[in-house]
Regions:
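Phosphate/Mg2+-binding loops and adjacent switch elements
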Residues: 1-102
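Short N-terminal micro-motifs specific to bacterial/archaeal maturation
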Residues: 1-4, 172, 242
Length: 260
């Protein structure tokens, strides 16, 4: 276990496990855990980008010192964190009492393993809206929890923070053209890589009978062949991006342009 300082940027630490061959041969990065001080987190998240980066990178988030604030404060904090990183589970902790199963072997950087643990990854957990430029493409995006939406069931109940760390989802029930997607992702990473904290997905590629597992940290992006599509399984793609003020429309429309 590597414990960093409270002001550390997790990005360079995570990248070391992929860029340094000697380290990669001997060590596997399992996950990034973020401990949040409920008493001071709101101010820290507002004042320090490093704190927001730590939320964006996290695979698991622990909320401590909840006994020092009221339930409304904790609820608002957890809502804010969820807006920044909806894929990371949050858990209140009492004097560091955490089950080891919530700390080790989370497989945050092994999406193939995550598919075994969570086979519903491709299924929509929120409603999706068609993209504005092509309503027939069946490509779309999901609202991150707490994100503004015109539907009456999504009226916000918490103060809205304009944090620079945000997440968005692309999904489609059309196959990607491999060459187009490779070119687009390569260009996107060159331009926006420093702002792309974590991204991952399961892809349906034209001409392949297997899922493609895709993930990355900043400019480091990789993919592996996953399991075959099961008979009768609905094929599709889902990509989750977490980053610093990423141009959502550029990503979504660009990905649509890579579909068959």
């Amino acid at each position: 276990m590597i414990e960093t300082t409270g002001l550390a940027d997790p990005g360079p630490v995570a990248q070391t496990f992929f860029m340094d061959d000697e380290i990669a041969e001997s060590y596997l990065l399992d996950s990034v855990l973020t401990l949040v001080d409920a008493k001071h987190a709101e101010q820290q998240l507002t004042d320090r980008q490093e704190a927001r980066r730590q939320i964006g990178f996290a695979d698991q988030i622990f909320i401590s010192k909840t006994d020092l604030v009221d339930d409304a404060t904790v609820s608002a904090l957890m809502h804010r964190i969820q807006q920044m990183n909806p894929r990371a589970p949050q858990q209140r902790v009492n004097f560091g009492d955490v089950p080891l199963a919530h700390v080790f072997d989370l497989r945050g950087f092994n999406l193939n393993a995550k598919l075994d643990i969570d086979p519903e990854f491709l299924n929509a957990e929120t409603h999706a809206h068609a993209s504005p430029d092509n309503h027939d493409s069946h490509a779309g995006h999901d609202h991150a929890p707490g994100e503004a939406c015109n539907h009456p069931h999504s009226q916000p109940h918490h103060h809205v923070h304009d944090d620079d760390v945000k997440s968005f989802v692309f999904r489609s029930d059309k196959a990607f053209v491999p060459a187009k997607l490779e070119d687009f992702l390569g260009a996107i990473v060159q331009v926006y890589g420093p702002k792309m904290l974590r991204y991952k997905g399961v892809l349906w590629m034209k001409g392949s009978d297997r899922k493609v597992i895709f993930q990355g940290v900043h400019q480091l992006m990789g993919s592996d062949l996953g399991p075959k599509w099961a008979p009768g399984e609905k094929k599709g793609s889902k990509m989750v991006f977490i980053g610093l003020d990423l141009p959502r429309d550029v990503f979504l429309h660009g990905l649509e342009g890579c579909l068959a």
